[in-house]
């Protein structure tokens, strides 16, 4: 099985970035990655909007898909139509609000959430965490069988998240995933993002 950058969604986390964040985003934007999810959970809405404006400029220049995260108001203010949401936020949006997004993703942690996300109009989902990860220390991964069950239950692309690396990306693809998510700031993935 051939794995390429187009199988990878890069998820930002400035705190993991070992180099200038904007330089890192520029490098990733020049790759063939499927996209960049601008996560940055620690920022206020105003801070997130300021960052999003800069990142969107970089991504648009390189023709890289950027997906905003959580802040639906920022997406509206910027007239931007791609967002990734936690399920609790997705559930609060009206059909009209959901339909305003051309790309609508959700973070799913169960088979039921995956089916619900698809029924709510998501165009893709992330499912996890699949493997043990530093982000969820002490919690065992849900495993490849969990991922396979989700991939079989929905007709939209599923991206595995949690502990995804070059050694296991083939395994998640074989389970039916469209690809995997990696933290784009992690220095251990330099070879994937350059």
Where are these regions (language model features)?
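Catalytic beta/alpha-barrel core
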Residues: 35-44, 62-91, 102-113, 126
């Amino acid at each position: 099985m051939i794995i390429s950058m187009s199988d990878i969604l890069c998820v930002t986390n400035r705190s993991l970035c070992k180099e200038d964040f904007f330089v890192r985003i520029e490098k990733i934007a020049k790759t063939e990655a499927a996209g960049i999810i601008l996560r940055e959970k620690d920022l206020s809405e105003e801070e997130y909007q300021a960052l999003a404006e800069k990142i969107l400029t970089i991504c648009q220049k390189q023709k890289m898909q950027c997906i905003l995260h959580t802040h639906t108001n920022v997406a509206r203010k910027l007239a931007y139509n791609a967002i990734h949401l936690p399920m609790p936020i997705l559930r609060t949006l009206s059909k009209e609000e959901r339909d305003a997004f051309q790309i609508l993703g959700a973070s799913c942690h169960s088979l039921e959430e995956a089916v619900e996300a698809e029924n709510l109009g998501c165009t893709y989902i992330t499912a996890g965490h699949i493997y043990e990860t530093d982000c969820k220390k002490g919690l065992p991964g849900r495993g490849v069988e969990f991922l396979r069950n989700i991939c079989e239950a929905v007709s939209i692309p599923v991206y595995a998240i949690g502990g995804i690396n070059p050694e296991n990306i083939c395994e998640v693809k074989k389970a039916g995933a469209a690809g995997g998510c990696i933290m784009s700031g992690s220095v251990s993935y330099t070879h994937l993002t350059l």
